[in-house]
């Protein structure tokens, strides 16, 4: 999965994060982070490296969902590349009931308008097709259609992208009241 995201310059993995839980007990409040600097998700020893982080005081602990962190590339209206940490996030769950994966986006470059509601067609055109292509390739790889996540204040998944916002006088909603920073 990460190879597809890398191919589209959406996620260059540099770390993995996960929590530990124990069946019948729940979350243990123990969080791990493993740097991939100098390593790779393709490393055959990686699963053992993750398991070796099991807390000593909890030999029955199991890993929860694994968050793949890193930077991705987005393009501005003039075509200039920008690297952005956590442009997209990939969460994979090794659950024995059935593995799952979730791809999340947290940037306005995927939508037709920025967070202030200003249309940005050149930015959308430079970025949204890459996300769409990656999602379609992930569906092919996994052999299962993606299920859209819950709608948020910032948008709603539609097909292999984001639903177009409602516009008034050609402007989308101003969402900056909820933007941190």
Regions of interest found by a model, annotated:
Residues 1-118, 124, 128, 149-152:
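Structured alpha/beta or helical-core interaction and ligand-binding surfaces enriched in interleaved
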Residues 96-181:
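Acidic, proline/glycine-rich low-complexity IDRs
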């Amino acid at each position: 999965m990460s190879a597809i995201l890398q191919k589209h310059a959406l996620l260059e993995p540099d770390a993995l994060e996960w929590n530990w839980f124990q069946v019948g007990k729940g979350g243990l409040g123990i969080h791990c982070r493993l740097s991939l600097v100098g390593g790779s998700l393709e490393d055959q020893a990686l699963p053992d490296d993750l398991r070796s982080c099991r807390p000593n005081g909890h030999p029955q602990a199991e890993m929860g969902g694994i968050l793949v962190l890193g930077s991705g590339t987005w393009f501005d209206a003039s075509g200039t590349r920008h690297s952005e940490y956590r442009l997209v996030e990939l969460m994979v769950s090794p659950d024995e009931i059935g593995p799952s994966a979730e791809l999340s986006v947290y940037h306005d470059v995927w939508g037709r308008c920025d967070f202030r509601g200003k249309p940005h067609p050149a930015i959308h055109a430079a970025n949204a097709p890459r996300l769409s292509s990656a999602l379609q390739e992930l569906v092919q790889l996994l052999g299962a259609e993606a299920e859209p996540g819950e709608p948020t204040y910032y948008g709603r998944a539609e097909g292999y992208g984001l639903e177009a916002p409602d516009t008034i006088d050609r402007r989308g909603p101003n969402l900056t009241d909820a933007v941190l920073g």
